[in-house]
Amino acid sequence: MVWAATTPTAANQPFNITNGDYTRWKLLWPKLAAFFDMEVGNVQTVKTQDIMADKEPVWAEIAEAHQLRKYAMSDIVTWPFLDYAFANGFDQMSSLTNIRQAGWTEVLDTEATVTDQLQKLRDNRIIP
């Protein structure tokens, strides 16, 4: 992070790094579904790493059908990390007081950031 490396007030400081807003997955799912022109499904309490373990051939078919770059699913997603991110039994609320006092002012809208990043992946033919 260039800002932390070049800002004297940031020297030797621990910071929480978040977008600056509070969001929940239940609020993001409709946006993600809309991005992919899909309906929102029901809540499932399964591990993605288990449910996706045998889906590499399905991804290969999707990639072929949409003329995507040839990436193995395992090259572009880490299922255990998604399981961690999806399975929090609590809201992630991190204080940005320390980083704000050091001079950081940027705030990102999580919904916009997620869809912007997905659009970049789509534009680069990594996802359909």
Protein language model annotation of sequence segments:
Residues M1-L82, S95, L118, N124:
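Mid/C-terminal beta-alpha module of Rossmann-like enzyme folds, strongest
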Residues F90:
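Glycine/small-residue-rich pyrophosphate-binding loop that anchors the diphosphate of NDP-sugar donors
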Residues R100-P128:
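C-terminal/domain-terminus segments
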Residues A85-F86:
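A conserved mid-domain beta-alpha-beta active-site/ligand-binding segment of alpha/beta enzyme cores
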